[in-house]
């Protein structure tokens, strides 16, 4: 087979495009977690460094449910801001701490879920962690006075819900973002939820 200039250029061009066409994956996960789900929403809901929304110690997590943002407070009055999905059935607010953390958590529908969606009864004993699990790749269980509030910060199986009122009350993040946050937050972290 004769190699022409055209075939050489076509092959070279196609080779440079191939990596861009493939989704970047978060390494080390048991399931394929895309690192580019944030491309599915408005730019303002993508992870970025911004001014801190409140004066708080570095490491504090702040949730602003009204604007669909979650912040991890850094030093020098700065924060990492993430877009989130928030509850469609009311606004809960308050101060909590991270009382439990799970990788690829099991999801169990609450009585409220079952009232709205009786078909979820099949998961009454729990849906195993995975890409179709509504809790996504990680979950932070929010506690007050050593008791579970039933509110969570977790991943999502529907990235397009970020920036919308789409959850049953919890705070949903892109799976890549919640994995990133999980690696930086520890048990007992203060979480301030504003509505």
Which ranges hold each PLM region?
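N-terminal secretory signal peptides and thylakoid transit peptides that target proteins
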Residues: 1-16
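Residue-level marker of structural boundaries
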Residues: 17-18, 187
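Boundary at the C-terminal end of the N-terminal hydrophobic targeting segment
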Residues: 20-23
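Cell wall/extracellular polymer interaction/catalysis modules
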Residues: 25-116, 131
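Exported/periplasmic cell-wall-interacting domains
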Residues: 56, 89-94, 105, 116-195
